Amino acid sequence: MTLERDAAAQVAKVLSEALPYIRRFVGKTLVIKYGGNAMESEELKQGFARDIVLMKAVGINPVVVHGGGPQIGDLLKRLSIESHFIDGMRVTDTATMDVVEMVLGGQVNKSIVNLINQHGGSAIGLTGKDAGLIRAKKLKVTRQTPEMTQPEIIDIGHVGEVTGVNTELLNMLVQGDFIPVIAPIGVGPDGESYNINADLVAGKVAEALKAEKLMLLTNIAGLLDKQGEVLTGLTTEQVDGLIADGTIYGGMLPKIRCALEAVQGGVHSAHIVDGRVPNAVLLEIFTDSGVGTLITNRKRH
């Protein structure tokens, strides 16, 4: 009985701590980029789906943007299509783009939608091609060495960048109590498909919706200082300083720049969240301690 009471008391404590956050975020939109380990572990997948459904149940509006790089790589390998990367971006020729659309728009998207719906949500799967949801153009990549007088233009195929977001469609779905689940495939002016980094799509969607929060699930504990300790709260100015002094570097740079752009573009805060932690989304939103790094714009306070 004592153990049961202790467990009940812990639940009550958690709910009590969550209440002010729930009140604060009722009616607000949160854009969550879902990827990494959180998409691979069955326990974490189930927990993510429950978190999303609970958010909607208490009046918060989640919009999910998902990745799927490992799943794309697996199918390309099975089809004997070689993968090439330049600056961390997948070179996407026509054959690869077909696979990207099959995996992201089909297999991955529908599995996430199905999981959320199994837990009582009303999720709808979309790609950026649906109603021109994610408008895009070809990403221009250049490279220059000291020996070159002019930068070299590198063609990485159907890789794009976001030029616009159909917020009317997303707002209609959110107001209808649906949970949009977006595959990061954009559509060009002539109907061509583009493979776009999911972090970038999530950031642009959050910015276009003027979302309360952008949450990027990762496979790390958050932004780390040079001693390896998690930096729990930063302003955009502090993040700029950490980039300048080399604390933030390598593969984290594109993710952090995406978060910075979103906050500077009107999103109230961006979060780098440890997706390896069960119920990471709820812990970051509804508890005092959180499970990652919060980035805000000083000018908004």
Curated annotation (Swiss-Prot):
Which residues does the UniProt site feature Transition state stabilizer point to? 33, 255
Pathway in which the depicted protein is active: Amino-acid biosynthesis; L-arginine biosynthesis; N(2)-acetyl-L-ornithine from L-glutamate: step 2/4
- Main localization, broad class: cytoplasm
Q: Where in the cell is it found?
A: Cytoplasm
Q: Which organism is it from?
A: Ectopseudomonas mendocina (strain ymp) (Pseudomonas mendocina)
Q: Does the keyword Nucleotide-binding apply?
A: yes
Listed transmembrane segments: none
**UniProt function note:** Catalyzes the ATP-dependent phosphorylation of N-acetyl-L-glutamate.
Keyword terms: Amino-acid biosynthesis, Arginine biosynthesis, ATP-binding, Cytoplasm, Kinase, Nucleotide-binding, Transferase
Domain of life, per lineage: Bacteria
**Residues reported in the UniProt entry to bind substrate:** 68-69, 90, 195
Q: What is this protein called?
A: Acetylglutamate kinase
